[in-house]
Curated annotation (Swiss-Prot):
ATP binds at K722. This is Leucine--tRNA ligase. A motif ('HIGH' region) lies at residues 40-51. It comes from Parabacteroides distasonis (strain ATCC 8503 / DSM 20701 / CIP 104284 / JCM 5825 / NCTC 11152). CDD domains: Anticodon_Ia_Leu_BEm. The lineage of its organism: Bacteria, Pseudomonadati, Bacteroidota, Bacteroidia, Bacteroidales. The gene is leuS.
Length: 946
């Protein structure tokens, strides 16, 4: 019976669906295990072979854990909101809901073909109202919460209001945008609008002025990762920095908990380090600088308080409010021109780019430690969102300050004994402090740091700042609050309306979900409002508690709804929780369900989400933990980043000025231009010439210079991309070789966490392996050849070696070496002509996570009437692995002369006798005396003769 993969795979797809093999329920009699893939954005292009890499890896592990007796939750869904669908809608007029639905259907079809063990009854789509109801619900809860630094958790905003009523801001230690001070009497005297404005300063979800990446052509704010080289990633439109009033989430309040939590989870060191750097904890001091000839002052934050005596200039971020306040009249034109230029650069570009730019403000600041007036400059290497948006520049001991000082000819004053700053700054934090104050200069303050180590000087300066009311000791974080609104259509609507004072009010939770309205255009309105401004019915009737026509707005009982929508990360920040209880219409997740599944045991996805989704999900989960909604503070116990499957591009070589193409090894004889060719018409680098001629009209009459009658293409490893014609559709592989071959081959390409090129040159070998496996069961006949005979020692050794190896490899995600071990074992069993049930049944159980279709078929051929998914993972027996004999190297005076096979359990004495009495030893001992024999058990017998 031949291995007919098409027939087998369809048969078992149908069976798994009909029997609901992968449907999972809470089962307190079994230990749980939750395996999750980062769910895909369903683009119109569908899946290419790079996408399933992580999905296959997680599927193998899910099946493995089920075979070990775990109750495994392994769901799949779609991150369905996003800019690409909206842009397509703008270009074609087709509603993004339709294109998204079609794309999801395509993805689902492709995923099902590969044979994943997803529980499709739990499928979620972030654009479904039943799903985004809970995104809106979480937002309302954040709006109605503040963060208490003392208790280190979110608390109801009503408690903060009560504190204001009782004692104002006295004694409060809470996360806020701006530190305010008022008494209870002052609070009570404020209007409702003033109170609401103040509360926005403390709410976890709030509206605030923030610097954003604004793309006028797209009519929306873009996240940093949506901007490349100053233009939008989507469409390549110009992007500028702009201050806008936006909805934000106070992620910064959770900065320390986000840091501390990294010590409790099993993530790679590199990923943890990325998050630590992104959160950016800095211990330092805030110091106030007065502006010369003015009553103004401003604050800087520094981690190097020891360098106060080396400040030779100050720098403001271009976005700082101080820029307008401190720019003098004669410098205004130059400053304004500079600000216009910097608007075109994102923060990421400013951080990465070392080009020095800046402009003098015309004002000076007084150094509180030296009394010197130092110039205040403006430069885009300072960011408004970190620290205070102003820095003190110490060019001798900071590389960016040094480059700036060199460029503009500013003083560089070294503060460490023996340091040379003639060519570069001295950034090391070790050494003895000098010039603090400088010799021969009348001290301005009574602090001297000279002779102290840098560490001692930092501590002394911090104490001086605190004792003399020059500022305060402070911990800063680089982590910013998340901008949470987008001027787009295709996203979650905010459950927000604006009252007569234009203050935001939340919809009642029982009125959720607030549905995304229909619009006739997906572009901003003529007056610049977001696309929801086109909606006819987009006002909130507070009496009837429903959406009504915009024309009815009276700002008494009917009010305008928010026109922005939520960003892409809104729907992906808690989706792992919804999978636990996807059909619950009363709660995000029921308490008993959450306490059973708890959190994700294994999460697999790409490293590109390190500073976006993975930060926001952790924040979101911690907030829900504070509210008592979830029982675990961290959402993802273990995280693995799969590598990327790169494209293997092929090239043909056109002789310049002709339509003639020359084969790879002959191209150096001509002047040629390499041209990308569709990899799907190339096999093992051999071009299908007829297919090439039919590929594009311009090649219909192409001519070829061949070698040995063949056209050999060139190749290169590049990003998999449609423009390079190197995208490989998994459907084609499944059709030609089967899903099991695709699954095995993707894992066989190399270590899971490394990037590797897609190369079909080895896929035939994997397919042959499955045929060889099939042959163990059927031989060359149409009937099953498996017997119940007792297995031999060699057969048992081969099997148990495999059990041990594959178990270890799966637990360590070393799938490529597992597949090598399978191939070795099947070769050994084929050589042994093994057809024993006691060997072959455990073999296919081991293979089931990797190649579930063929394993299921062979399992049923062996007479089982239940799915192999419910079999039990075999355990190896060390007794079968013990070697019966071992090869000794027999040496004379330290030189190996021959090998001798001896029993593995032989004693040292018997090994010595065997070596001395062996016929091969006679010639090396002839005429000599044996002086000593050294036996290293299991390895060497060394005979010393003389």
């Amino acid at each position: 019976m031949e291995y007919n993969f098409r027939e087998i795979e369809k048969k078992w797809h149908d069976y798994w669906i009909a029997e609901k093999v992968y449907k999972v329920e809470k089962d307190t009699n079994k230990p749980k295990y939750y395996v999750l893939d980062m769910f895909p954005y369903p683009s119109g292009a569908g899946l290419h072979v790079g996408h399933p890499l992580g999905y296959i890896a997680s599927d193998i592990y899910s099946r493995f854990k089920r075979l070990q007796g775990f109750n495994v939750l392994h769901p799949m869904g779609y991150d369905a909101y996003g800019l690409p669908a909206e842009q397509y809608a703008i270009q074609t007029g087709q509603h993004p809901e339709i294109t998204t639905k079609n794309n999801i259907a395509r993805y689902r079809e492709q995923l099902e073909k590969i044979g994943f063990c997803y529980d499709w009854s739990r499928e979620i789509r972030t654009c479904d109202p039943e799903y985004y109801k809970w995104t809106q619900w979480a937002f309302i809860r954040m709006f109605n919460s503040y963060y208490c630094n003392d208790e280190k958790q979110a608390r109801p905003i009503s408690e903060l209001i009560q504190a204001f009523e009782t004692s104002g801001t006295e004694g409060l230690n809470v996360a806020c945008g701006e530190e305010l001070s008022f008494t209870a009497e002052e609070w009570k005297a404020k209007s409702d609008k003033e109170k609401q404005e103040i509360l926005l300063n403390y709410r976890i979800a709030y509206r605030g002025e923030t610097m954003v990446n604004w793309c006028a052509a797209l009519g929306t704010v873009l996240a940093n990762d949506e901007v490349v080289n100053g233009v939008s990633e989507r469409g390549g439109y110009p992007v500028e920095q702009k201050i806008m009033r936006q909805w934000c989430l106070r992620v910064s309040a959770y900065a320390q908990r986000l840091l501390d939590g990294l010590d409790t989870i099993d993530w790679t060191d590199s990923l943890k380090e990325t998050q630590k750097n992104w959160i950016g904890r800095s211990e330092g001091a805030e110091v106030r600088f007065k502006v010369k000839d003015s009553d103004k002052e401003f604050t800087i934050f520094t981690t190097r308080a020891d360098t106060m005596f080396g400040v030779t200039f100050m720098v403001l971020a271009p976005e700082s409010e101080l820029v307008q306040q401190l720019t003098t009249a004669d410098q205004k034109a130059e400053v304004d021109a500079y600000l216009d230029r910097t608007k075109k650069r994102t923060e990421r570009e400013r951080i990465a780019d070392r080009q020095v730019t800046g402009v003098f403000s015309g004002s000076y600041a007084i150094n509180p430690f030296t009394g010197e007036a130092v110039p205040i400059w403006i430069s885009d290497y300072v960011l408004a969102g970190y620290g205070t948006g102003a820095i003190m520049a110490v060019p001798a001991h900071d590389s960016r300050d040094y480059a700036f000082a060199k460029h503009f000819g500013l003083e560089i004053r070294p503060l460490v004994e023996g340091c040379d700053v003639s060519k570069e700054s001295f950034d090391a934090k070790e050494g003895i402090v000098c010039n603090s104050p400088r010799t021969g200069v009348t001290p301005y303050c009574d602090l001297s740091l000279n002779g102290l180590t840098i560490k001692e000087a930092i501590a002394a300066t911090k104490k001086y700042v605190k004792d003399h009311d020059l500022g305060r000791v402070k911990i800063n974080y680089r982590l910013r609050d998340a901008i949470f609104s987008r001027q787009r259509y295709w996203g979650e609507p905010f459950p927000v309306y604006y009252d007569a004072d234009s203050m935001p009010q939340m919809l009642p939770e029982e009125c959720l979900p607030l549905l995304l309205p229909e619009v006739d255009k997906f572009l901003p309105t003529e007056t610049g409002e977001p696309p929801l401004g086109h909606a006819v019915k987009w006002a909130w009737d507070t009496v009837n508690q429903k959406v009504t026509e915009v024309s009815k707005i009276d700002n008494q009982t009917i009010f305008p709804l928010e026109l922005c929508t939520m960003p892409g990360f809104a729907g992906s920040s808690a989706y792992y929780l919804r999978y636990m209880d996807p059909h619950n219409d009363k709660a995000l997740v029921a308490k008993d369900v959450d306490e059973y599944w708890r959190n994700v045991d294994l999460y697999i996805g790409g490293t590109e989400h390190a500073t976006g989704h993975l930060i926001y999900s952790r924040f979101w989960n911690k907030f829900l933990f504070d509210l008592g909604i979830v029982c675990e503070e961290e959402p993802f116990k273990k995280l693995i980043n799969q590598g990327m499957i790169q494209g293997r591009s092929n090239f043909v070589y056109r002789i310049n000025g002709t339509n003639k193409f020359v084969s790879l090894n002959l191209k150096d004889q001509y002047e040629v231009t390499p041209i990308h060719v569709d990899v799907n018409i190339v096999s093992n680098d051999l071009l299908d010439i007829e297919a090439f001629k039919n590929w594009r009209p311009e090649y219909n009459d192409a001519e070829f210079v061949l070698e040995d009658g063949k056209y050999i293409c060139g190749w290169a490893v590049e990003k998999m991309s449609k423009s390079m014609f190197n995208v490989v559709n998994p459907d084609m592989i499944v059709e030609k070789y089967g899903a099991d071959t695709l699954r095995l081959y993707e894992m066989f390409l190399g270590p899971l966490e490394q990037s590797k090129p897609w190369d079909t040159n080895g896929i035939d070998g994997v397919h042959r392996f499955l045929k060889k496996l099939w042959g163990l069961f059927f031989g060359n006949t149409d009937t099953l050849q498996v017997t119940d005979a007792e297995p031999t020692a060699d057969e048992l050794k081969s099997l148990h070696k495999l059990i041990k190896k594959v178990t270890f490899d799966i637990e360590h995600f070393s799938y490529n070496t597992s597949i090598s071990a399978f191939m070795i074992c099947v070769n050994e069993l084929t050589s042994l002509k093994c057809s024993k049930r006691a060997i072959l049944e455990p073999l296919i159980t081991l293979l089931a996570p990797f190649a579930p279709h063929i394993a299921e078929e062979l399992w049923h051929q062996l007479g089982h009437d239940t799915t192999i998914c419910d079999a039990r993972w075999p355990k190896h027996n060390e007794e079968y692995l013990k070697e019966k004999s071992v090869v000794y190297a027999i040496s004379f005076n330290g030189k190996a002369r021959y090998n001798l096979e001896l029993p593995a359990d032989i004693s040292k004495e018997d090994a010595e006798k065997a070596a001395l009495n062996h016929e091969n030893s006679a010639k090396w001992m002839e005429g000599k005396t044996v002086k000593k024999v050294i036996v290293v058990p299991g390895k060497i017998v060394n005979i010393v003769v003389g």
